[in-house]
A protein has these predicted regions:
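Short amphipathic alpha-helix with an adjacent loop that forms part of the alpha/beta core around
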Residues: 59-69
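An accessory alpha-helical subdomain
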Residues: 129-213
């Protein structure tokens, strides 16, 4: 499998199944997409900013639900293999991406694995074991949380500096931005939410290039 990042802004995601797994999937996608959760019952859990539809569709009714909701992605999170099979089949027939919460290992065309993620916006790090070991994914995610702390602020800072360095040669620009990213002083300033983090970064660039930004 090859990891891809998909922008679900403005897209619709259908989660079939209102148990703990369905709730977790709904919360995750609701950060960005319009989420509809379809289930006969709902747990006393948060489903994020999602719409809940109370219904118990049979496998034969799944195609009609997909046609009605028209999602970009459908998540099969029920405890019925027959129902999950029907969801997968109907999604495949319509060219809709699908994710099965009850399946690990290899996937067919059009089926996706939703990896564990660590966020420090706009930075996102994803970890996947191909759904073969969710426990390992969770462990690695916890390890990464401290590693990328502050990466979001660094991304915003270097993105701004890159725009300001647009007139210098690409080689000099890359070297300057790498120096900022490698600078412990800049990371420390960002970690303490210091207002002078930008000045520290420009000083690093000036030391390298002999010019100020």
């Amino acid at each position: 499998m090859i990891p891809l990042v998909h922008d679900f802004t403005g897209e619709r995601v259908l989660v079939v199944g209102g148990g703990p797994v369905g709730a977790r999937k709904a919360r995750r996608f609701a950060r960005e997409a319009e989420v509809v959760v379809l289930s006969p019952t709902f747990e006393a859990e948060s489903y994020g900013d999602s719409q809940r539809l109370r219904a118990a569709p049979d496998p034969e009714e799944i195609p009609d639900w997909l046609d009605r909701i028209d999602p970009a992605l459908v998540v099969a999170a029920t405890d019925s293999t027959d129902l999950n099979d029907a969801i997968e089949r109907a999604a495949d027939e319509r060219g809709i991406l699908s994710n099965r919460a009850d399946r690990s290992g290899s996937r067919n065309l059009g089926q996706v694995v939703v990896p564990a993620t660590v966020r420090d916006d706009p930075v996102v790090a994803a970890i996947s074991t191909g759904a073969s070991s969710p426990a390992l994914s969770r462990h690695l995610r916890q390890e990464l949380e401290s590693t990328i702390s502050g990466a979001g602020s660094m991304a915003e800072l270097t993105g701004s500096l890159r725009d300001e360095l647009a007139t210098v040669s690409s080689e000099t620009r890359r070297a300057a931005l790498r120096a900022v990213v490698d600078s412990e002083a800049v990371w420390k300033a960002l970690d303490t939410e210091s207002a002078n983090a930008r000045q520290v970064a420009t000083d690093v660039i000036a030391d390298l290039t002999g010019d100020s930004v």
